């Protein structure tokens, strides 16, 4: 990185080199003497801009000694004021009571201790100062525009002044050229850079102006032109000649790291350039003041006075312009001072924070040392743990090898155990099956023995029964033959009776059919009557409607009471009911005489059925009468006709059911006769077949008993074999358990020793042993 340096001297006689890195990377702390030298230089620069300083350069010849002394006192007073101002600014940085700033600003002297304490934190706060200045320049475009407009106005005034006085403006052109370069640039967004020319800046001390004033007071006989041309004595010229050796070279760009005083830096640079230009002009115009004093003449003195007067006029004009500029700059500087005061108050807060941070840093340092001690302890413990880990790893490797060997043995034993267990399970299943079969065989054998005993008893009983049955059969044959003959006679009689009954039933059916036909004819007649009655009813309704209309009219004409109308209605209803009962009686009398000749010929069962039908008919007719009384005449006639049709249908259905019952009875009688005859003939054959079946069953039972006995013997043999196998398997299981216990005991002994030596490193091993035990179990 390229670095820009600024070099300052406190005076031409004793140069003190101080370098300030203006780059954004490093800022070197300043000592107390360097800060005082910079403040002295800045005071001289500020005095060069004042109108008093401008007057002293050209008008020292006309001033008396008293005025010169007063002028020097004023300069000294102003310098002390500037020093006090800078001292107050430095004191404000460490002042905790911000409210006492107004009292301390004019009274408190320069506090070098506070400056040195602040210099310690200059490197820390550099980044914050740069950021604050960047924020001010970026956040305040009005400030940038004011600076830019002020530079424009200044340039315009200078151009107009140059047009009026081209001779004298050439001298001051060099002085203002470098000072105005900063203002001619447009307001940038980034922090502004102070551009200076690459020439050597030459500074002189306040002693130059003082020496000029003293010599002018000591030599009043010399003319004013002599004072103007020879304003510097030989000693000062010699000192002035030594300045290039102590000159400071500026780079072209100086970053604005001194954020607190950017305007002072710019004015200081322009003032330094004006000092240099005036000194160069005086060096050019004054070759040797002793030789010029001898060669001058009074005519030349007059010419010089005129020139001096003209120059004074022009300088007065310049001073007026300069005063205006300085007034503007003073206003701006006042604003800037207020802003800086606010910044200083903020910086005081930052200083408190920094003090707190110091305390925190000290605490952190103490904690750091404690942590270092703890770290050393932990290192020692880690070394011990590493040694323990190495030993434990060795033991673990040994235990792993043992574990692998044991696992292999365990797998082999487990495989053998699984095979033996499978065999044991299969043999146990076979044993259970054989035991269950044996029990079932015992049960079946006991049952078969019981059945055999029963069959033998039955055989004896059957033999006795067959003998007695043969005797009985012989007797029964004789009796049955006699009964058969008697039954044949009775059967013939029954056939004759059945034929007679059939003929009677046929005649009854014919009569019933005729009655049904008569009923159908009567129903058709009743339908025609009902149709006629409906027509009559419609006519009666129409007449009733007409009569009602007439009655309503007559009621309107002649008022009739309501109870008389109610009596008339009741009389009409009674008349209608009497007519309906007469019609129902006539229909009932017409139906009953037709059925009377049939009842004489029927059996008592038929008479009962006919009486039931008659009662049902009576009940139906009674219901019909009740319905007719409740309903209108039209509905009653239609329902009466429908119910009569239903009654006829019911009668036909009952007749059909009677015929079907008769047929079923005839079939049953014939079947019974045939079955009885067959049973009497086939009894001996059936008994012989049953005896043959019993004999075959006995033979089968004997064969099964023998086969079951053989099966039981085989099962007993198998049980004996299975018992022997079970005993052998139990012995093997005991042997396997002994083999499994031995490696466990061997593994426990070395593990217990290792656990006693290194208890911490073997904390995870019991879990592994538990898992292995669970697997074994």
Swiss-Prot record:
Tissue specificity statement from the Swiss-Prot or TrEMBL entry: Testis-specific expression in normal tissues, but wide expression among cancer tissues and cell lines.
Compositional bias annotation for Basic residues: 743-752
Superkingdom of origin organism: Eukaryota
Residues forming coiled coils: 303-560
Keywords: Coiled coil
InterPro entries: CAGE1_homolog, CAGE1_N
Region span, Disordered: 737-777
Protein name (Swiss-Prot/TrEMBL): Cancer-associated gene 1 protein
Gene source species: Homo sapiens (Human)
């Amino acid at each position: 990185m390229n670095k820009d340096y600024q070099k300052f001297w406190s005076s031409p006689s004793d140069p003190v080199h101080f370098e300030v890195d203006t780059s954004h990377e490093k800022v070197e702390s300043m000592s107390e003497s360097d800060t005082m030298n910079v403040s002295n230089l800045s005071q001289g620069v500020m005095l060069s801009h004042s109108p008093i300083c401008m007057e002293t350069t050209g008008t020292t010849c006309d001033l008396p000694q008293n005025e010169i002394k007063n002028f020097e006192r004023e300069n000294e007073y102003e310098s002390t004021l500037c020093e006090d101002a800078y001292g107050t600014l430095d004191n404000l940085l460490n002042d905790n009571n911000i409210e006492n700033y107004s009292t301390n600003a004019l009274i408190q002297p320069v506090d070098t201790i506070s400056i040195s304490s602040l210099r310690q934190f200059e490197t820390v706060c550099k980044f914050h100062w740069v950021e604050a200045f960047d924020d001010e320049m970026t956040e305040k475009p009005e400030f940038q525009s004011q600076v830019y407009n002020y530079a424009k106005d200044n340039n315009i005034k200078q151009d107009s002044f140059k047009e009026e006085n081209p001779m004298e403006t050439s001298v001051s052109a060099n002085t203002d050229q470098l000072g105005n370069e900063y203002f001619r640039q447009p307001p940038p967004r980034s922090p502004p850079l102070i551009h200076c020319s690459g020439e050597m800046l030459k500074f002189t001390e306040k002693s130059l102006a003082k020496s000029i004033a003293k010599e002018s007071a000591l030599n009043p006989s010399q003319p004013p032109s002599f004072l103007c041309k020879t304003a510097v004595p030989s000693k000062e010229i010699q000192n002035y000649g030594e300045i290039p050796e102590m000159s400071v070279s500026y780079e072209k760009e100086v970053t604005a790291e001194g954020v607190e005083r950017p305007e002072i830096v710019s004015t200081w640079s322009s003032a330094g350039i004006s000092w240099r230009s005036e000194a160069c002009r005086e060096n050019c115009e004054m070759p040797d003041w002793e030789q010029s004093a001898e060669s001058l003449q009074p005519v030349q003195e007059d010419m010089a006075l005129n020139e001096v007067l003209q120059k004074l006029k022009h300088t007065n004009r310049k001073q007026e312009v300069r005063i205006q500029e300085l007034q503007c700059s003073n206003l701006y500087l006042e604003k800037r001072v207020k802003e800086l005061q606010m910044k200083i108050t903020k910086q005081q807060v930052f200083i408190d924070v920094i003090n707190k941070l110091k305390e925190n840093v000290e605490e952190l340092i103490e904690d750091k040392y404690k942590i270092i001690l703890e770290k050393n302890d932990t290192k020692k413990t880690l070394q011990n743990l590493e040694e323990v880990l190495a030993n434990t790893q060795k033991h673990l490797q040994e235990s792993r090898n043992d574990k692998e060997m044991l696992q292999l043995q365990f797998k082999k034993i487990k495989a053998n155990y699984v095979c033996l267990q499978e065999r044991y399970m299969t043999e146990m299943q076979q044993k259970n099956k054989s035991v269950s079969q044996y029990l079932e065989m015992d049960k079946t054998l006991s049952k078969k023995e019981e059945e055999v005993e029963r069959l033998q008893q039955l055989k004896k009983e059957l033999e006795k029964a067959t003998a007695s049955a043969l005797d009985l059969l012989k007797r029964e044959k004789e009796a049955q033959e006699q009964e058969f003959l008697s039954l044949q006679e009775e059967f013939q009689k029954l056939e004759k009776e059945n034929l007679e009954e059939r003929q009677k039933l046929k005649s009854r059916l014919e009569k019933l059919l005729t009655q049904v036909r008569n009923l159908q004819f009567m129903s058709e007649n009743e339908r025609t009557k009902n149709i006629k009655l409906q027509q009559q009813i419609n006519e009666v309704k129409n007449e009733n409607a007409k009569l009602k209309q007439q009655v309503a009219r007559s009621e309107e004409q002649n008022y009739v009471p309501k109870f008389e109308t109610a009596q008339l209605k009741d009389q009409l209803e009674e008349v209608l009911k009497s007519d309906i009962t007469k019609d129902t009686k006539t229909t009932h009398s017409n139906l009953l005489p037709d059925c009377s000749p049939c009842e004489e010929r029927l059996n008592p069962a038929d008479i009962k059925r006919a009486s039931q039908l008659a009662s049902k008919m009576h009940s139906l007719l009674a219901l019909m009468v009740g319905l007719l009384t409740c309903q209108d005449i039209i509905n009653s006639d239609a329902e009466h006709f429908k119910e009569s049709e239903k009654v006829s249908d019911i009668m036909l259905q009952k007749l059909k059911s009677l015929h079907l019952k008769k047929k079923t009875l005839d079939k049953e009688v014939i079947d019974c006769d045939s079955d009885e005859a067959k049973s009497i003939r086939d009894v001996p054959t059936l008994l012989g077949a049953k005896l043959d079946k019993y004999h075959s069953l006995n033979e089968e039972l004997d064969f099964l008993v023998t086969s079951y006995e053989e099966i039981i013997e085989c099962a007993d043999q198998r049980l004996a074999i299975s018992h022997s196998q079970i005993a052998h398997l139990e012995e093997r299981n005991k042997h396997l358990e002994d083999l499994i216990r031995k490696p466990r005991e061997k593994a426990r002994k070395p593990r217990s020793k290792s656990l006693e030596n290194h208890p911490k490193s073997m904390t995870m091993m019991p879990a592994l042993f538990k898992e292995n035990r669970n697997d074994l179990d």
